[in-house]
Amino acid sequence: MSGKGAPELSVRNCGDLRVAVIAAQWHEKVMDGLVDGALRALHELGIDEPTLLRVPGSFELPVVAKVLAGRGYDAIVALGVVIRGGTPHFEYVSQGVTLGLTQVTVDTGVPVGFGVLTCDTEEQALDRAGLEGSNEDKGHEAVTAAVATAATLRTVSEPWR
């Protein structure tokens, strides 16, 4: 299972961060779990007014993330699902989304939490969606990673003493 060995991140003093969550609409049940996990994580971190935007699919996540990164957000979380089918479409979309979101982070300095599931089957996606009986909660994990990185960036941006 991919969740083994995940770090336990301690994130404090982040309630004033501006965070946006962008969620694709394909695979509604999986997406509902990812969004719920993301919003729960934000609430636990004291971030009670995040921006939540929906896009048609995972391929649209990078362009919206790039625009939001230029609008003063401290962290962005991208949530989506790409499930392998019988054509090369899976590889193209997975690679495009991954590279696109990475490029947004590198170009803008705004962390983008990667909550895009790339799975062989819908069952694998459901098992990672944070639903009752799921083994993992990737929406929650993506928020924690993005906010922890934003908090680190805030620390290194402060003047050295």
Swiss-Prot record:
Chemical reaction(s) catalysed: (2S)-2-hydroxy-3-oxobutyl phosphate + 5-amino-6-(D-ribitylamino)uracil = 6,7-dimethyl-8-(1-D-ribityl)lumazine + phosphate + 2 H2O + H(+)
Pathway(s) where this gene product acts: Cofactor biosynthesis; riboflavin biosynthesis; riboflavin from 2-hydroxy-3-oxobutyl phosphate and 5-amino-6-(D-ribitylamino)uracil: step 1/2
Positions annotated to bind (2S)-2-hydroxy-3-oxobutyl phosphate: 86-87, 128
Keywords: Riboflavin biosynthesis, Transferase
Assigned GO CC terms: cytosol; riboflavin synthase complex
InterPro entries registered for this protein in UniProt: LS, LS/RS, LS/RS_sf
Keyword set includes Transcription regulation: no
EC number: 2.5.1.78
Superkingdom as given in the UniProt entry: Bacteria
Keyword Transferase: yes
Pfam families listed in its UniProt record: DMRL_synthase
Binding of 5-amino-6-(D-ribitylamino)uracil, residues: 26, 58-60, 81-83, 114
A single BP term in Gene Ontology: riboflavin biosynthetic process
Record-level Gene Ontology MF annotations: 6,7-dimethyl-8-ribityllumazine synthase activity
Disulfide bonds: none
Transmembrane domains' residue ranges: none
Catalytic residues in the record: 89
Family, as annotated: Belongs to the DMRL synthase family.
Function noted in UniProt: Catalyzes the formation of 6,7-dimethyl-8-ribityllumazine by condensation of 5-amino-6-(D-ribitylamino)uracil with 3,4-dihydroxy-2-butanone 4-phosphate. This is the penultimate step in the biosynthesis of riboflavin.
Protein name as annotated: 6,7-dimethyl-8-ribityllumazine synthase
Naturally occurring in which organism (per UniProt): Streptomyces griseus subsp. griseus (strain JCM 4626 / CBS 651.72 / NBRC 13350 / KCC S-0626 / ISP 5235)
Recorded name of the encoding gene: ribH
